Design a protein with these regions (language model features):
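Iron-associated oxidoreductase/ferritin-like identity signal
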Residues: 1-161
Length: 161
């Protein structure tokens, strides 16, 4: 019974990461700034890796791996991110900040369970990735680095004209 419970919790984490991939897809489809796109794509790749890592454990414990597609909750997250992203880069990042804060809280809660050392180590590693994501997105919303990038491009094109 405990093993089934552990598999269910691992599946929940894997599904959360699969849902995050969909949200990143939605944001990336609307963000034109290369600087932001590159960073968000890196975070998307992290979430894909999390799904793969968690699925390996799920399979090892006899469970059914999670598909890399959003469930109902993930579809809602992706739709909300897509709609918000239509209002520009800052709005897209605010939506992603909410998604990453939720993911961070979920990983923090997951670490309250009694896991084997191998599983705990993996969840801690993923949580550190999530912290890095939320810190970058929060800072990007605060400092708007894409505006500096636009200004630099604009200044450079004026100098050449």
């Amino acid at each position: 019974m405990a093993e089934n419970s552990e598999v269910a919790r691992l599946r929940s984490l894997a599904q959360l990461d699969a849902d995050a991939v969909g949200a990143y897809d939605a944001a990336l489809a609307r963000i034109p700034e290369q600087l932001v796109r590159e960073r968000l794509n890196d975070f998307r790749i992290d979430h894909m890796r999390h799904v793969q890592d968690l699925n390996a454990l799920i399979s090892q414990f006899g469970g059914t791996p999670v598909d890399l597609r959003p469930d109902f909750k993930g579809a809602a997250m992706k739709s909300l991110t897509a709609m918000t992203s239509m209002m520009g880069t800052e709005a897209a990042l605010v939506a992603m900040l909410g998604n990453e804060e939720f993911t961070n809280r979920t990983y923090d809660l997951a670490l309250r369970f009694d896991w084997s050392p191998e599983v705990r180590s993996l969840i801690e590693k993923h949580r550190e990735d999530e912290r890095r994501h939320v810190l970058w997105v929060r800072e990007a919303v605060r400092t708007r680095p894409w505006e500096r990038q636009r200004a630099a491009v604009h200044d450079g094109s004026e100098a050449q004209a």
